[in-house]
């Protein structure tokens, strides 16, 4: 299970995890969050989650209201380049983590961390489900 960055991502993950544990008590449910996420202690404390891991992630800033100005904004572009490397590192970390964990399925809920985990899962041939209740 992966997602994070806000309670809006984590809360549905925990609800799905609790229901899965009711229906499949022997299922091993693992949460993969974003490295440095201040909310990672929430899934770690939940009894439905058996283990918590973290990987690098980043985002691409694309502010439509700024138009052409954003394209030439060096700070925005520098942050995008930095986060591209974070995403690539996250895919690499996720690939090896998934190889070790050998999950049958990946459940993604959104947030920046979902991208590297889902991409690594896809490259590894692991099916994934994307949940969006918004």
Where are these regions (language model features)?
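Conserved nucleotide-sugar donor-binding subdomain of glycosyltransferases
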Residues: 76-108
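Conserved nucleotide-sugar phosphate-binding/catalytic loop shared by glycosyltransferases and other
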Residues: 1-6, 21-86
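Active-site-proximal region of nucleotide-activated glycan assembly enzymes
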Residues: 27-28, 50, 123-134
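Residue-level detector of alpha-helix initiation sites
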Residues: 7, 111-113
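Short amphipathic alpha-helix
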Residues: 9-21
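Glycosyltransferases and closely related glycan-assembly transferases
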Residues: 93-106, 115-129
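Short beta->alpha connector loops at strand-helix junctions that form conserved
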Residues: 54-58, 109, 130-133
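Short glycine-/acidic-enriched loop or helix-start segments at secondary-structure transitions
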Residues: 10-13, 40-43, 64, 116-119
């Amino acid at each position: 299970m992966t997602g994070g960055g806000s309670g809006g991502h984590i809360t549905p993950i925990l609800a799905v995890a609790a229901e899965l544990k009711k229906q499949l008590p022997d299922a091993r449910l693992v949460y993969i969050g974003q490295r440095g996420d201040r909310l990672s202690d929430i899934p770690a404390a939940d009894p439905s989650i058996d283990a918590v891991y973290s990987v690098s992630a980043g985002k691409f800033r694309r502010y439509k209201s700024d138009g052409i100005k954003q394209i030439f904004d060096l700070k925005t572009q520098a942050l995008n380049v930095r986060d591209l490397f974070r995403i690539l590192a996250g895919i690499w970390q996720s690939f090896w983590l998934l190889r070790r964990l050998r999950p049958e399925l990946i459940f993604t809920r959104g947030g920046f961390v979902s991208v590297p985990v889902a991409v690594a899962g896809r490259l590894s041939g692991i099916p994934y489900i994307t949940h969006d209740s918004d």
